[in-house]
Amino acid sequence: MNIFADFDARIKKTLQDIDLKPKDGGELDLSRIGVEPPRDASHGDIATNAAMVLSKAVGQNPRELAARIAEALKADEDVESVDVAGPGFINLRLKASYWQRELLVMLNEGTDFGRSRLGAGKKVNVEYVSANPTGPMHVGHCRGAVVGDVLANLLKFAGYDVVKEYYINDAGAQIDVLARSVMLRYREALGESIGEIPAGLYPGDYLVRVGQELAGEFGTKLLEMPEAEALAIVKDRTIDAMMAMIRADLDALNVHHDVFYSERKLHVDHARAIRNAINDLTLKGHVYKGKLPPPKGQLPEDWEDREQTLFRSTEVGDDIDRPLMKSDGSFTYFAGDVAYFKDKYDRGFNEMIYVLGADHGGYVKRLEAVARAVSDGKAKLTVLLCQLVKLFRNGEPVRMSKRAGEFITLRDVVDEVGRDPVRFMMLYRKNDAPLDFDFAKVTEQSKDNPVFYVQYASARCHSVFRQAADQLGLVDLDRVAMGSHFEKLTDESEIALVRKLAEYPRLIESAAIHQEPHRLAFYLYDLASSFHSQWNRGAENPDLRFIKVNDPDLSLARLGLVQVVSDVLTSGLTIIGADAPTEMR
């Protein structure tokens, strides 16, 4: 249960009980009332701004109104004390019995604790990675892959119907270049000396194997075909090979998409999907024939000093109108974006989330304009931009040459440090802030390495369970037994740990609402820190050890507390896509 939602309802009920009314009549607007943890834990367990947001409507001084509300809240059987602070904040401290009951709820819910129905009935498409199928994934793709994947997992846990999607850019000019590059490697595999790879083609050695496979399958037959026919075959085989490589790279990172959507699908049957999308916009009055003035600075590739078919995107929030069709009748790349969004909308998605690199910042307004025009403002579109990742080794920048083939791949990073450190650390900054990734730092065993610190907390929980088996003979811990004596958990440090656990449902919902999966990584680190602190208190004070052989009931209660810590760590790490280890190796 979300205790903050619980007390939000209690506080609003209290406002009704004291017959709080607007001075001008009517009903009070309670929508701005906030109920959250105090910024300073010493101030209490629950804080609300109710008096400050209602004082003007009620016509009463905020502190005086706060005192009136506070007095009424003291009647709540779960409230230990109520204080008014600052300009009119109300801080509530709850009784230990309340936290003990809440801990039992958490224990009974297990790893489902924190699961929400926030997104019930809402269908969301999360598109992420969508790297061009022209080679292996490099480290630059890594952050967007993790942010998108964890956000999708988070939304699912919060009750949304989520589809993870990858858009395969397999219809552009770069694919023609790729096919010609592989054709060269095919000829090389047949024994021809190809010399240096010509400028403009892809030089990477990863294409050698594709050429060899073509030579093994076709022999010299491709050389005997008309070039266009041979290149069409090479293109299909190469895209399949590149996507197999990309899928393998993503699998190594524990990233799995539900849908791989081919751009070429939009171009089949004389680009029917694109034509239909443009026709729909035309019927809505969003398309016209005209000429665009030359933009300042570098000219975009879709600008022409001729009449074109244009999207009236400035009327739906964009900076300039956008070309859909060139003067020669060919479609712009942007026209494909319109058709792709329409396809998503027609599949029934209420919300579309695009996770893109920071270099795609210029796409945001045009995509938002497409969403408004295609859906008549009914669909929500969000673009999350991921800033660059800078690689370091022992504090020194890792140099990457731009020369042929000399770049660090996603697989290089995962193979060196492991999947879990990569996923966790890619979340340890908000997506729109640059991130430093130090190969040495993410593998060290210290508090300064967040992923180690969190996973070590999980392993320590299971260490306590093994001690219970050795010292108390409790091989199979029973949740009913562990929850039968929570009234024995009275030490302030134990209650503080329960408070931290109780924040989890609110954290899940707020991270989902704001689409900020990094909040989960921060919370898990804080929870791990609280648990490690409690472990250390037991090392210093025998009375606070999790297992007291001479007090089995207290031991069971503390084991129940440890079990809930383990459950929440497991739940959070699962959403992140990392393991919750039972021991550190």
Swiss-Prot record:
Q: Which SUPFAM superfamilies match?
A: Anticodon-binding domain of a subclass of class I aminoacyl-tRNA synthetases (SSF47323), Arginyl-tRNA synthetase (ArgRS), N-terminal 'additional' domain (SSF55190), Nucleotidylyl transferase (SSF52374)
Where would I look for the motif 'HIGH' region in this sequence?
A: 131-141
Read off the Pfam families from this record. Arg_tRNA_synt_N (PF03485), DALR_1 (PF05746), tRNA-synt_1d (PF00750)
- Kindly indicate whether the keyword DNA repair belongs to this entry: no
The identity of this protein, by name, is Arginine--tRNA ligase
Give the GO terms filed under biological process for this record.
arginyl-tRNA aminoacylation
Its family?
Answer: Belongs to the class-I aminoacyl-tRNA synthetase family.
What reactions does this protein catalyze? Answer: tRNA(Arg) + L-arginine + ATP = L-arginyl-tRNA(Arg) + AMP + diphosphate
Class of enzymatic activity (EC top level): ligase
Enzyme Commission numbers on file:
6.1.1.19
Task: Note the CDD domains from the entry.
Answer: ArgRS_core
* Gene3D superfamilies named among the record's database cross-references: Arginyl tRNA synthetase N-terminal domain, HUPs, Isoleucyl-tRNA Synthetase, Domain 1
Q: What is its main location?
A: cytoplasm
Q: Sorted alphabetically, which PROSITE patterns does this protein's record hold?
A: AA_TRNA_LIGASE_I
How does the record describe its quaternary structure?
Answer: Monomer.
| Cell compartment(s), UniProt | Cytoplasm
Q: Which UniProt keywords apply?
A: Aminoacyl-tRNA synthetase, ATP-binding, Cytoplasm, Ligase, Nucleotide-binding, Protein biosynthesis
A single Gene Ontology CC annotation of this entry is: cytoplasm
Keyword 4Fe-4S present in the record's keywords: the answer is no
| Highest taxon in the source lineage | Bacteria
**Molecular function terms from GO:** arginine-tRNA ligase activity; ATP binding
UniProt xrefs under NCBIfam families: argS
